[in-house]
């Protein structure tokens, strides 16, 4: 498979047009998910040219490796990954790209989860019978805007290794973004304050960082086990719990079964709410702050 993908990659490289002089001066960055693309563009500004391998509407756990993705990696100076096994598929893509700058352990391979306070780290041995449980903990930390200062500092450090003379500019960009994020955080915290302690049901357990940040409680999951479709008996239990505890919101991702989520919510007297798991996951969530804006506004509206 890798040999075939490399052959397709070679053809793509032949067809690739020559980069412009302006583009050649930029640091070529590839990120695994669009949240990291958005944050890298905030920090890097005009110094970077950034591509993301996954789209916001895709389940980042299950990305299909294609020659177009390997082409992006083949030309990258830096690969920025989420880590915590969310983007473990990146190793396969890097192998096909044949770029020594971004192999695991190389200076151009950056895991920005370093320093993040990881939630839901399993306390027992994990096996496949438990579903898609992450042995290193829940990897969806970018849903908590409070993690952005750590992640953006890791990005600054990564870019400064390639362009050490531009560190001061990178730091200024970061501080400018964090100032805007602080203003937004004040707005989000004020809007979510009346909802503290409210219970929600989630389709898939990837929202714990967002819920914890704003004081909401994850009462149940629509999946029986992570990544495994629920049985009718499990769905009945969830509906009964939602009725008994007067839970009004069921959070669902764009790629999951909205028809099922709507049916469960309707039977429970609740609402199914589509949030943005990633930047670009829903219409209007095209920036990092914009994605959190959407999620906060959708929750506040649904819980009125």
What positions do the PLM features span?
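Bacterial N-terminal signal peptides that target proteins for export
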Residues: 1-9
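Intrinsically disordered/low-complexity terminal segments and short unstructured peptides
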Residues: 3, 19, 30-31
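Hydrophobic h-region of N-terminal signal peptides that target proteins for export
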Residues: 11-22
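Extracytoplasmic metal-acquisition and chelation regions
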Residues: 23-304
């Amino acid at each position: 498979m890798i040999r075939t993908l490399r052959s397709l990659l070679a053809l793509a490289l032949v067809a690739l047009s020559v980069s412009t002089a302006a583009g050649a001066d930029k640091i070529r960055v590839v990120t695994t998910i669009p949240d990291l693309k958005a944050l890298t563009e905030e920090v890097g500004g005009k110094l970077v040219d950034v591509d993301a391998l996954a789209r916001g509407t895709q389940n980042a756990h299950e990305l299909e490796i294609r020659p177009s993705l390997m082409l992006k990696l083949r030309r990258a100076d830096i690969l920025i990954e989420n880590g915590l096994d969310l983007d473990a598929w990146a190793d396969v893509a890097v192998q096909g790209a044949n770029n020594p700058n971004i192999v695991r352990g190389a200076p151009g391979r950056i895991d920005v989860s370093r320093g993040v306070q990881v939630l839901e780290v399993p306390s027992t041995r994990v096996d496949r019978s438990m579903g898609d449980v992450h042995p290193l903990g829940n990897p969806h930390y970018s849903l908590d805007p409070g993690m952005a200062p750590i992640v953006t500092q890791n990005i600054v450090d990564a870019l400064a290794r390639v362009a050490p003379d531009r560190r001061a500019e990178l730091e200024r960009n970061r501080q400018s973004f964090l100032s805007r994020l602080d203003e937004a955080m004040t707005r989000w915290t004020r809007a979510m304050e009346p909802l503290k302690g409210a219970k929600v049901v989630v389709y898939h357990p990837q929202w714990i960082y967002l819920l914890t940040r704003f004081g909401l409680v994850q009462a149940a999951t629509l999946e029986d086990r992570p990544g495994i479709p629920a049985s009718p008996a499990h769905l009945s239990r969830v509906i009964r719990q939602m009725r008994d505890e007067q839970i009004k919101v069921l959070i669902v991702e764009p790629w999951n079964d909205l028809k099922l989520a709507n049916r469960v919510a309707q039977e429970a007297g609740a609402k199914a709410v589509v949030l943005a798991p990633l930047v670009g996951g829903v219409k209007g969530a095209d920036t990092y702050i914009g994605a959190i804006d959407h999620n906060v506004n959708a929750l506040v509206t649904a819980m009125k």
